[in-house]
Amino acid sequence: MGGGGQQTDRITDTNGRFSSYTWEEVQKHTKHGDQWVVVERKVYNVSQWVKRHPGGLRILGHYAGEDATEAFTAFHPNLQLVRKYLKPLLIGELEASEPSQDRQKNAALVEDFRALRERLEAEGCFKTQPLFFALHLGHILLLEAIAFMMVWYFGTGWINTLIVAVILATAQSQAGWLQHDFGHLSVFKTSGMNHLVHKFVIGHLKGASAGWWNHRHFQHHAKPNIFKKDPDVNMLNAFVVGNVQPVEYGVKKIKHLPYNHQHKYFFFIGPPLLIPVYFQFQIFHNMISHGMWVDLLWCISYYVRYFLCYTQFYGVFWAIILFNFVRFMESHWFVWVTQMSHIPMNIDYEKNQDWLSMQLVATCNIEQSAFNDWFSGHLNFQIEHHLFPTVPRHNYWRAAPRVRALCEKYGVKYQEKTLYGAFADIIRSLEKSGELWLDAYLNK
């Protein structure tokens, strides 16, 4: 009854109609190889489809046994096309007596959120301004060209090299925000064009893998700040985060590092090492182990371009040093911006909340300004981005007042901070988590 997930596994009654299920029955199918999801009251067996899912293997599993309607709508800009892929997986629908929402979720809130999405669509918030993204790509290419020309004209002296490194790090950081736009399918009308340009930006301009990014990032969006589902809160035992994990580690006497000092050693092993060490290794390991040869070719094209440009001036050794110094600076930029909206927020195990509530407890916004928009790639509107990941980032500000009003209506906390305050909260939250760990380690 739970296996397969192909068209031949459909379950029908004697009249050839699809079966009806209760939520209790659906919630039994959550294990690997036996996974059902509900979308728009229809029940789908995705047990085998997870292996072919373009969004990654795990993201569907994270919603097994649940209503995935909001996630389904949020991630897919072309719903009609995606529904065609779902048809062979259909095995039934919820019984008429069953609510549309599972696990006692607030039906009125869910319906109001869906109405908000429809209103934003009607107001054109999901429509792209091509010039916006063309200018962003143009300024990245311009920065790359300026860096090369500075070495060409002014040589390899220390001061000039430092300026060149800052320019290259800026280009890399901005390319990181731009690939994020294409990865979320928020630029072109077709997924194919978004995927193609995504591979160009993340592969050729950054030397990373689109497949690796998709696998990690979509899980993060689907279940933000949820242990065992969001890879961004898997700290590899280097840190304990939130209020739950530190106590668990403390009670179990787990001490891989002195976590009560993590707010101090964060400066040495967090921002400096994430991209140049951990991501660098993980990206290549992922591409090779999973046979992502197209991604690997795009990635290699970046390294060929970089070393052709800079070994002629610096030689191989110093070109490698420059490369890693650029990665080192980019890593600081990336970590502070991406973590300011998540690490200080609630981090816990699955609580089966509705889409709006789940995203709002895990994200916060940063005050809008021209600098903050550019510096963070508009991730200062993290709340709106998480609720509507396919909305082009130049329209987040239009959605923000509507989202805030909906949150106020239902008593959902909508947090907005200053940039400096958000940075400081990262350290404060790490310190608090470390103190919770130490107390549990010594006294429980």
Curated annotation (Swiss-Prot):
Motif Histidine box-2: chain residues: 217-221
Enzyme class: oxidoreductase
SUPFAM superfamilies, per the entry: Cytochrome b5-like heme/steroid binding domain
Name this polypeptide is given: Acyl-CoA 6-desaturase
Short motif Histidine box-1, span: 180-184
Family annotation (InterPro entries): Cyt_B5-like_heme/steroid-bd, Cyt_B5-like_heme/steroid_sf, FA_desaturase_dom, Fatty_acid_desaturase
Record localization: Endoplasmic reticulum membrane
One Pfam family in the UniProt entry: FA_desaturase
Ranges in the topological domain labelled Lumenal: 152-157, 286-305
Gene Ontology MF annotations: acyl-CoA (8-3)-desaturase activity; acyl-CoA 6-desaturase activity; oxidoreductase activity, acting on paired donors, with oxidation of a pair of donors resulting in the reduction of molecular oxygen to two molecules of water
An individual GO BP term: lipid metabolic process
Family from the record: Belongs to the fatty acid desaturase type 1 family.
Reactions mediated catalytically: (9Z,12Z)-octadecadienoyl-CoA + 2 Fe(II)-[cytochrome b5] + O2 + 2 H(+) = (6Z,9Z,12Z)-octadecatrienoyl-CoA + 2 Fe(III)-[cytochrome b5] + 2 H2O; (9Z,12Z,15Z)-octadecatrienoyl-CoA + 2 Fe(II)-[cytochrome b5] + O2 + 2 H(+) = (6Z,9Z,12Z,15Z)-octadecatetraenoyl-CoA + 2 Fe(III)-[cytochrome b5] + 2 H2O; (8Z,11Z,14Z,17Z)-eicosatetraenoyl-CoA + 2 Fe(II)-[cytochrome b5] + O2 + 2 H(+) = (5Z,8Z,11Z,14Z,17Z)-eicosapentaenoyl-CoA + 2 Fe(III)-[cytochrome b5] + 2 H2O; (8Z,11Z,14Z)-eicosatrienoyl-CoA + 2 Fe(II)-[cytochrome b5] + O2 + 2 H(+) = (5Z,8Z,11Z,14Z)-eicosatetraenoyl-CoA + 2 Fe(III)-[cytochrome b5] + 2 H2O
Gene3D superfamilies, per database record: Cytochrome b5-like heme/steroid binding domain (3.10.120.10)
Transmembrane segments: 131-151, 158-178, 265-285, 306-326
Known function: Fatty acid desaturase with bifunctional delta-5 and delta-6 activities. Component of a lipid metabolic pathway that catalyzes the biosynthesis of polyunsaturated fatty acids (PUFA) with preference toward n-3 substrates and Delta-6 function.
Pathways involved: Lipid metabolism; polyunsaturated fatty acid biosynthesis
Top-level division of the source organism's lineage: Eukaryota
PANTHER family registered for this protein in UniProt: ACYL-COA 6-DESATURASE, FATTY ACID DESATURASE 2
Originating species: Danio rerio (Zebrafish)
Topology of the protein relative to the lipid bilayer: Multi-pass membrane protein
Residue numbers on the Cytoplasmic membrane side: 1-130, 179-264, 327-444
Chain location of the short sequence motif Histidine box-3 per the record: 382-386
Enzyme Commission number, as recorded: 1.14.19.3, 1.14.19.44
Location of the Cytochrome b5 heme-binding domain: 18-95
